């Protein structure tokens, strides 16, 4: 059963990221209080768009192929999240704070809701954040490009090969769909220097 509805950007269906529907798959939420259907959308809106949180900026740079030395403006951050969908695999709070790990029961229970979400969102690319998550994924249709990256909050995270794999998956999806993307995967029209703390 799905508890946390996915974030679906306003341009996910019409334009996507570089003309491709990209679903970013996180691992889990942590928190206290009541789990609600809108929790994921509230988190992405607050920390991906309205405020600046390194975790969400790292995801944007990873998925959009943006250089680590590039400062992403507030407008660019907001625009990115309108182009993609985001969903957390585990459908329960794992604990009251970060680094609380899902239980085996949580991992197993998450598959049906994830497959229903895939059927609903029809992504062309799924970007899986976290190598451990890879071990628990159910079979995903072969028509979907699936790529993996270390979790952006993991110690010593580097964009390196993960970024390249994601960009290749987006390119393959765009070409196999029979259409070329209208815009590059990198949504930045202009760049500026990186600012401290990001």
Residue ranges of predicted features:
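An amphipathic alpha-helical core segment
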Residues: 123, 131-134
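Catalytic metal-binding/acid-base residues of hydrolase active sites
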Residues: 29, 90, 132-133, 153
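A polyanion-binding, active-site-adjacent surface
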Residues: 1-125
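C-terminal capping/extension of enzyme domains
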Residues: 97-115, 133-198
